[in-house]
Amino acid sequence: MALLVRVLRNQTSISQWVPVCSRLIPVSPTQGQGDRALSRTSQWPQMSQSRACGGSEQIPGIDIQLNRKYHTTRKLSTTKDSPQPVEEKVGAFTKIIEAMGFTGPLKYSKWKIKIAALRMYTSCVEKTDFEEFFLRCQMPDTFNSWFLITLLHVWMCLVRMKQEGRSGKYMCRIIVHFMWEDVQQRGRVMGVNPYILKKNMILMTNHFYAAILGYDEGILSDDHGLAAALWRTFFNRKCEDPRHLELLVEYVRKQIQYLDSMNGEDLLLTGEVSWRPLVEKNPQSILKPHSPTYNDEGL
């Protein structure tokens, strides 16, 4: 009989915990130790139900709100607001042959892209004022200094053309190919020993890929990161005047912005690139470049 009375008391205490959306009804304090233990163990599922209903838990002396309002991030600007790399749809066959190291069909003719790449590299060499770099950056007039300046401008062209999809990436490979052909030819004209030239070509190749990684990291970071990349690569960690770094950081930033303003299709078909001066006489003169004139007969 006593056991039956205890069971009935326990059922009564449990039934008093009725979940309500706004709060939980507390148990009367006159219950025994066994009833309190059962009531404490039954609190967790009831609390989860009150959270699901969006209510709050009422505890004597403590007011805890369980229905928290979570922060929702506002929608950022769409991809239409900022230029994005061109994504081309390619078939399975194209993916297979490109995975094997071959180049699939492109948007434009490959021989036109090759000629445009040659023109773009030529603009890096012929349209750059090397004497101004030697003077303002206090660089010696040597073959290594010429290579560092050319490398910087070739990298800026690669950054721009990688935004033009598969055709732009193909053009980047051709630009780099023409650069190494030119470096090797200049070494032969200077009368460098073939063995020494081959050894130096390996060193310059390693320096080229290290510089590309450093410049890419610098252009994606702030001016401190870009200045560090230029100090390590362009100045070979030998720049005593910080104004030279400041000048070069400004030059790279404005030149990248200037190249981004050029039409991608025009660059793929003509390869015509113009460079801003190292020191601007009129800072307001940085305007959108004129569209180039096409000459299909000469292609």
Curated annotation (Swiss-Prot):
Record's GO cellular component terms: cytoplasmic vesicle; mitochondrial inner membrane; mitochondrion
Assigned keywords, A-Z: Cytoplasmic vesicle, Membrane, Mitochondrion, Mitochondrion inner membrane
Main location, first listed in the record: mitochondrion
Localization per Swiss-Prot or TrEMBL: Mitochondrion inner membrane; Cytoplasmic vesicle
Keyword check for Plastid: no
A matching Pfam family: Ubiq_cyt_C_chap
Protein name: Ubiquinol-cytochrome c reductase complex assembly factor 1
Organism name: Homo sapiens (Human)
Lineage: Eukaryota, Metazoa, Chordata, Craniata, Vertebrata
